C-alpha cells in the first residue's frame, strides 16, 4: 500500500482517483482539488506531488523537501495582500501585521510567473509542477491569463486548490480534472486534531458548529478564539441579554476594536451570530450582525461600526424590530 497519502484522513474518492492516475501513469495537465477548507486538500496535494516526482512508492527525503518548499521544480502560489506597496502572502499576513480587512488575491503577475515556470525546463524532476492555492481568489485579469496557459498545456502539471470552484471561470474548470473533497465525520476530526491545549477536552460548541466537519477550519476557529481577550465573549452575550448599559457598550467596542485586527473582528461577529442563534434564534439580531459584518468589510471605521451596533443591541432596538 502506498504511503503517499498516509496522513490523509478520509477522502476515499480523492485518494482513489489520485492513486489511479499515478499507478496508470496517466496524468492530466491540470487538476482541481475542490472542497471545504481544512479537510485535507493540501495534504493530498503534497502526497500527489511526491508521487508525481518520485513515483508511486514515494521518497522520504523528497517529502521533506516538498514540505519545506525546497524543490526547484515546485512552485506553490497563494493569494496575497497588498500592504504598503508590497505583496504579502496570505500565510504570512498575520506575522507581518497586515490588517487583512480586504480579501487577498491571486494577481496577474503571479499567474504570469506560473506560465513562465511551467514553460521552463525542469532542473531535477521530469516535469515542473505548480500549485495554485486559493484559486478562486484570482482577479479577472489573472483568471484570463491562466486560461491561456491551460489552453496550451505543456509537460508541466498544475494543481488548483479551491474552496468555491463555482467562482472559477467555467472554461478553467472544464480544463481540469476534478478531485472532490468532502467534510469529515466527527470521529475523523478527532483523529486529526487533539483537544485545545489548556482547555476542556471539548471545544466550545460554537467552534464545532462553525467548523462544519472541517478539522482545518476548527483549528482556525480555535486560533481566533484564543485571540479574543478574556471576558469579551461573555460581555457580548450579556449585552444582548440586557445586562449592559450604554457606557459599557462603548467600552466593549473600544476594547475589541483595539485588541483584534480586521479578520479577527470579522470572525468574532461570526462566532457571536452562532452563539446567539443557539440561545435566542431571533432573526432581527442576526440581521443586525450581518449588517455589522458588511460594514467591517466595507472599510467603515471599525470602532464606530461596533459602537453603533452595540448601542442598538444594548438598547433593545434589534430585539424588538
Where are these regions (language model features)?
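Charged, glycine-rich active-site and insertion segments that engage polyanionic ligands
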Residues: 1-65, 155-157, 163-321
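Conserved catalytic/switch belt of AAA+ P-loop NTPases
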Residues: 119, 144-159
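Conserved adenine-binding aromatic site and its adjacent loop/helix in ATP-hydrolyzing domains
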Residues: 116, 148, 174
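Clamp-loader machinery-focused feature within the broader ASCE/P-loop NTPase space
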Residues: 1-141
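Helical "lid/switch" subdomain of P-loop NTPase nucleotide-binding domains
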Residues: 110, 130, 134, 138, ...
Amino acid at each position: 500500500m502506498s504511503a503517499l497519502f498516509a496522513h490523509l484522513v478520509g477522502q476515499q474518492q480523492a485518494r482513489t482517483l489520485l492513486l489511479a492516475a499515478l499507478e496508470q501513469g496517466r496524468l492530466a495537465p491540470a487538476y482541481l482539488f475542490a472542497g471545504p477548507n481544512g479537510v485535507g486538500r493540501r495534504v493530498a496535494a503534497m502526497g500527489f506531488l511526491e508521487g508525481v516526482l518520485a513515483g508511486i512508492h514515494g521518497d522520504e527525503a523528497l517529502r521533506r523537501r516538498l514540505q519545506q518548499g525546497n524543490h526547484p521544480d515546485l512552485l506553490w502560489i497563494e493569494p496575497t495582500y497588498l500592504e504598503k506597496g508590497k505583496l504579502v502572502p496570505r500565510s504570512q499576513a498575520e506575522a507581518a501585521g497586515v490588517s487583512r480587512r480586504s480579501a487577498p488575491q491571486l494577481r496577474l503577475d503571479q499567474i504570469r510567473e506560473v506560465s513562465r515556470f511551467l514553460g521552463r525546463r525542469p532542473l531535477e524532476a521530469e516535469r515542473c509542477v505548480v500549485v495554485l492555492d486559493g484559486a478562486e481568489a484570482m482577479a479577472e485579469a489573472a483568471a484570463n491569463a491562466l486560461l491561456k496557459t491551460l489552453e496550451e498545456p505543456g509537460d508541466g502539471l498544475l494543481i488548483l486548490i479551491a474552496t468555491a470552484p463555482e467562482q472559477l471561470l467555467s472554461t478553467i474548470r472544464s480544463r481540469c480534472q476534478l478531485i472532490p473533497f468532502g467534510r469529515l465525520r466527527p470521529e475523523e476530526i478527532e483523529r486529526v486534531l487533539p483537544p485545545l491545549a489548556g482547555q476542556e477536552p471539548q471545544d466550545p460548541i460554537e467552534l464545532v458548529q462553525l467548523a462544519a466537519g472541517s478539522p482545518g477550519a476548527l483549528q482556525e476557529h480555535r486560533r481566533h478564539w484564543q485571540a479574543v481577550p478574556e471576558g469579551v465573549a461573555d460581555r457580548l452575550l450579556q449585552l444582548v441579554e440586557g445586562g449592559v448599559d450604554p457606557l459599557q457598550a462603548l467600552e466593549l467596542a473600544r476594547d475589541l476594536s483595539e485588541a483584534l485586527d480586521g479578520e479577527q473582528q470579522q470572525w468574532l461577529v461570526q462566532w457571536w451570530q452562532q452563539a446567539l442563534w443557539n440561545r435566542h434564534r431571533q432573526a432581527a439580531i442576526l440581521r443586525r450582525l450581518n449588517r455589522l459584518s458588511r460594514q467591517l468589510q466595507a472599510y467603515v471605521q471599525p470602532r464606530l461600526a461596533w459602537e453603533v451596533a452595540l448601542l442598538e443591541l444594548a438598547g433593545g432596538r434589534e430585539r424588538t424590530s
